[in-house]
């Protein structure tokens, strides 16, 4: 039976009936590109959401947009992306701009990427906090840092043309959308690259079809390459017969014949047949092959029924109709290019018809599984976990496949699929529930999930994560583009433990100008400019700063930002920042944080009891005076130390004298042990021993405002030297105790004057709350950057660069760990023989 499902799907938000509230777009009478209709749709949707109408500010051009102003541009229909625009407008007011017409934008040759284009916006609807929006003109035009849009909309051809071959990250393109809309290509990716079950499929294609390689094989998909379908009818009949009689078709009684390819996407053109009707099936396939083009295919596939589970007795004697379930998932390319499931929505329909997007109102996964007879909560949770894993595997496979395409095939060197919809059905295979992947899309799942979230808010459900996750991903990619080509002055290269800096700088496109004391440092060949200058005697950092400024002037260097990741150089970096007029922590604040006794002495005046009693030691006389003020047991360590070198638990004055004598004898200057602060001298500190568990808190602070915080746990330290033994992330502490640590770390930084930067704070948590050990006025060292990136996604290095540029980093508002890491410390002196 031939079935045609064509035309608008009225329940999807993209096809809502619009009311014209304000008539034509201000200043765009008779707009031929449909901007008026799109603008009216935007106003109607804002009204339905209870938000104010767009304010027309186009008469007064907006000026002053520079290279550090972020612009995320959405091209095309406003409806699918409206929640994302509103969320992004709240997170970064004015950064999200909606472009409704090709006349609002222009393409100019890229200055940074030959052969590419920059997208300039002369007009757009920008979104602010509180759901406010404004129609604005931009003089000079704003340069887009990230572009996406409704590439799958057949009426939006101008969207694809504007977004083609751009020099900024582009979330999709028309060629990529066409690949997603081609059911055969999608199933090949899902089966061959993601190892997901798909309906048994026999596909006939014309010619070589290079987008469908023979390797790796796609389980469940049989590909037949035809040269002339009219002359190969016997081959077609043989393949159809073998498919219908094959083992893969044994569980199924019906098949579907349909054309596939992006031109056929959404038409619903298909015919359904019983498996026994071999002649009719072959005839239907042959009829479709007559009009086959090289971009299309003809599919013969099993009609996989939705699993039927035992249900409780019905309340009504009325017969139960067989139903079908479609599971719609939306996944985005999140931090570190990792797939992240954003939302799931289900639609239910009659079993004899395909359940399509927009044919029914969406509902939640958990309630749908309950309705289907999955009673046990643990089984429903297991299915939800499998669905997340399958969806994210599909996205990972798609990204890997796209990476193998040429820039022309992708629609640009910077074009990638950032938002992916994957449809599944719940089948029963060998008496077990199985998620079968059906198809992919670039827009329909987004619309369905947006509708599901709006419906939830209508009955008092809290806002979901979908708009936040998508807005954060877009803003993050825009910020990555924002830092490309920026000149960063780095003070101090550090050791091998900082090798990741050079790799990250290359990946982010940073131009590093390095000031380093070692003229033979390995990083000299990895940076844009190497400036050897011996600054190891840090007690003269004011003079060093003047010399560094002279070096920059002599080279004609004007960096956009200056910072240091190396503990010894943080004060010098702050002084150079001040001399250049760049953003960074004040030198006085860094000095307070760098010198441990000054840190605690400064914080003693604070009403919050985070500081620990301590005394500075420069002589044995100081030791005698300190033991009268600091109770034993106590901790003796270097005043400016790093890496726990020289730290020791002392039980009495004699042990303190002995430890101080050893340190003052063996550690005199930087040559004795580079990188542990001896350039500041070898003064010591005696501080009260604080019981409790030890933790690191890594903070991102911008203008005194906390943007991000991550708590990690340290295992019990090995006394008396307090060597770190283990660590884990995320913290095992309950949320309220982590909140105590974060608040204490933030208050300590603020009290010291550290208002801009990425800082690492070491604390102990006892029964009475947090106590400060020390503040490191730089990014957390050793494993912390890599671990935070692996577990949560954000990169502390990028965050530090953005803060130094004067741009508040976009970080996850509700960070959720993607994995758990635990590590055991191994030292060459202790474990070298065992590990050899």
Where would I find each of the regions flagged by the language model?
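Phosphate-binding site of ATP-dependent enzymes
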Residues: 249-253, 271-374, 660-717, 733-746, ...
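Conserved hydrophobic helix-helix packing surfaces used for dimerization/oligomerization
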Residues: 69-72, 487-489
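Active-site nucleotide/adenylate-binding loops and adjacent lid/helix of ATP-dependent enzymes
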Residues: 1-4, 8-16, 20, 28-29, ...
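Short N-terminal binding/cap micro-motifs at the start of the first secondary-structure element
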Residues: 80-84, 448, 496-501
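Conserved N-proximal alpha/beta basic substrate-recognition cap immediately N-terminal to
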Residues: 8, 18, 36-49, 78-246, ...
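Short, polar loop motifs at secondary-structure junctions
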Residues: 102-104, 515-521
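ATP-dependent carboxylate activation and anion-phosphoryl transfer catalytic cores
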Residues: 1-61, 316-317, 335-339, 350-486, ...
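N-terminal basic/disordered segments at the start of proteins
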Residues: 492-508
């Amino acid at each position: 039976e031939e079935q045609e499902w064509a035309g608008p799907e009225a329940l999807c938000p993209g096809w809502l009936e619009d009311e014209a509230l304000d008539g034509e777009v201000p200043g765009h009478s008779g707009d031929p590109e449909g901007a008026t209709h799109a603008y009216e749709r935007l106003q109607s949707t804002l009204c339905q959401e209870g938000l104010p109408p767009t304010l027309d500010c186009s008469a007064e051009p907006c000026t002053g947009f520079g290279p550090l102003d972020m612009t995320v541009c959405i091209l095309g229909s406003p409806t699918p992306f409206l929640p994302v625009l509103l969320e992004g407008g709240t997170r970064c007011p004015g950064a999200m701009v909606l472009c409704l017409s090709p006349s609002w934008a222009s393409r100019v040759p890229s200055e940074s990427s030959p052969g590419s284009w920059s997208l300039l916006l002369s007009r757009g609807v920008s979104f602010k906090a509180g759901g406010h929006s404004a129609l604005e003109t931009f003089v000079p035009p704003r340069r887009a840092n990230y572009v996406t849009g409704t590439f799958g909309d057949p009426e939006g051809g101008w969207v694809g043309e504007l977004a083609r071959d751009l020099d900024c990250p582009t979330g999709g393109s028309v060629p990529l959308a066409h690949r997603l809309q081609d059911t055969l290509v999608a199933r090949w990716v899902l089966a061959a690259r993601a190892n997901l079950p798909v309906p048994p499929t026999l596909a006939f294609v014309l010619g070589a079809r290079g987008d469908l390689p023979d390797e790796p094989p796609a389980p469940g998909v049989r590909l037949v390459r035809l040269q002339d379908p009219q002359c190969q009818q016997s081959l077609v009949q043989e393949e159809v017969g073998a498919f219908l009689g094959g083992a893969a078709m044994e569980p199924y009684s019906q098949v579907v014949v349909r054309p596939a390819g992006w031109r056929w996407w959404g038409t619903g053109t298909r015919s359904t047949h019983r498996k026994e009707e071999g002649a009719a099936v072959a005839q239907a396939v042959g009829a479709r092959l007559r009009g086959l083009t090289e971009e299309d295919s003809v599919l013969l596939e099993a009609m996989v029924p939705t699993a039927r589970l035992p249900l409780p007795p019905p309340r009504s004697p009325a017969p139960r109709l067989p139903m079908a379930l479609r599971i719609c998932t939306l996944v985005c390319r999140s931090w570190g290019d990792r797939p992240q499931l954003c939302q799931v929505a289900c639609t239910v329909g009659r079993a004899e018809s395909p359940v399509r997007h927009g044919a029914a109102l969406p509902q939640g996964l958990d309630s749908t599984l309950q309705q289907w007879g999955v009673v046990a909560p643990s089984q429903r949770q297991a299915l939800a976990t499998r669905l997340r894993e399958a969806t994210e595997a599909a996205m990972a496979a798609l990204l890997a496949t796209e990476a193998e395409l040429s820039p022309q095939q992708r629609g640009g060197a910077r074009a990638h699929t950032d938002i992916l919809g994957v449809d599944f059905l719940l089948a029963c295979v060998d008496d077990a529930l199985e998620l079968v992947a059906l198809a992919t899309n670039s827009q329909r799942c987004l619309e369905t999930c947006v509708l599901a979230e709006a419906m939830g808010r209508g009955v008092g459900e809290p806002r979901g994560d979908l708009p936040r996750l998508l807005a954060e991903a877009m803003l993050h990619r825009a910020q990555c583009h924002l830092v490309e080509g920026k000149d960063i002055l780095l003070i101090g290269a550090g050791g091998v433990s900082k090798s990741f800096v050079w790799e990250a700088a290359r990946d982010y496109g940073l131009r590093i100008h390095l000031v380093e004391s070692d003229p033979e440092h390995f990083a000299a060949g990895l940076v844009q400019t190497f400036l050897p200058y011996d600054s190891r005697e840090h007690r003269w950092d004011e003079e060093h700063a003047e010399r560094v400024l002279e070096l920059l002037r002599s080279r004609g260097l004007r960096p956009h930002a200056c910072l240091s990741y190396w503990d010894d150089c943080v004060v010098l970096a702050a002084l150079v920042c001040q001399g250049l007029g760049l953003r960074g922590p004040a030198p006085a604040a860094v000095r307070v944080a760098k010198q441990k006794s000054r840190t605690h002495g400064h914080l003693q005046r604070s009403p919050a009891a985070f500081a620990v009693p301590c005394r500075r030691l420069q002589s044995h006389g100081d030791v005698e005076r300190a033991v009268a003020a600091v109770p034993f047991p106590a901790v003796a360590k270097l005043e400016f130390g790093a890496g726990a070198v020289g730290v020791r638990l002392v039980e009495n004055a004699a042990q303190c004298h002995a430890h101080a004598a050893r340190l003052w004898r063996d550690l005199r200057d930087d040559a004795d042990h580079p990188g542990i602060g001896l350039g500041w001298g070898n003064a010591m500190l005696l501080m009260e021993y604080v019981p409790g568990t030890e933790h690191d808190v890594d903070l991102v602070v911008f203008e005194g405002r906390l943007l991000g915080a991550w708590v990690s746990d340290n295992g019990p330290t090995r006394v008396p030297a307090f060597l770190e033994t283990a660590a884990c992330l995320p913290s095992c502490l309950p949320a309220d105790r982590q909140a105590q640590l974060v608040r204490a770390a933030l208050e300590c930084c603020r009290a010291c004057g550290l208002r801009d930067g990425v800082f690492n704070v070491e604390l102990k948590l006892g029964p009475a709350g947090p106590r400060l050990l020390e503040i490191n006025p730089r990014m957390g060292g050793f494993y912390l950057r890599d671990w935070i990136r692996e577990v949560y996604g954000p990169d502390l290095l990028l965050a530090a660069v953005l803060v130094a540029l004067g741009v508040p980093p976009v970080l996850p508002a509700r960070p959720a760990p993607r994995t758990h890491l635990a590590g055991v410390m191994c030292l060459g002196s202790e474990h070298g023989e065992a590990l050899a």
